[in-house]
Amino acid sequence: MKRPVTLTVNGARTTVEVEPRALLVHVLRDELNLTGTHIGCDTSQCGACTVIIDGYAVKSCTVLAVQAEGQPITTIEGMGSVDALHPLQQAFWEKHGLQCGFCTPGMIMTASDLLSHNPDPSEEEIRHALEGNYCRCTGYVNIVAAVKHAASLIREGARAGALA
């Protein structure tokens, strides 16, 4: 039997009727049409479905939608826009951190969590943070470079904002 669940996704509050066993990833994709969150394995192995819940990267295939009620959720669609990319999106583009792009939303969301808690990570810290995200195309070198570059872009932006 479906029940109403109120989710705050990318700053917008919405109520949807879902089965209590519905996974957040399916609600995001099928009910809210936020298809940037990918389903790669449905077993919490690949990281393609990663979103930010209450400030932390979470694999949305491991969370019931009802568990996310009342917590802010950010998906890749909430990270930037076509006209104003988020620094992580910009860095992935500039540093060629994607090929097919399937893993990219999850990588960016995981990197966002890392950079929100550690604004100047080492290469080792970046690699450790991304351990739960799989990429079959790039070999991770450009992804790590993109995260490192994004960190510098974010720090530069913060400095510029402090001077304004």
Tell what function each PLM region has.
Residues M1-A164:
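Signature of N-terminal electron-transfer/Fe-S-associated modules in redox systems
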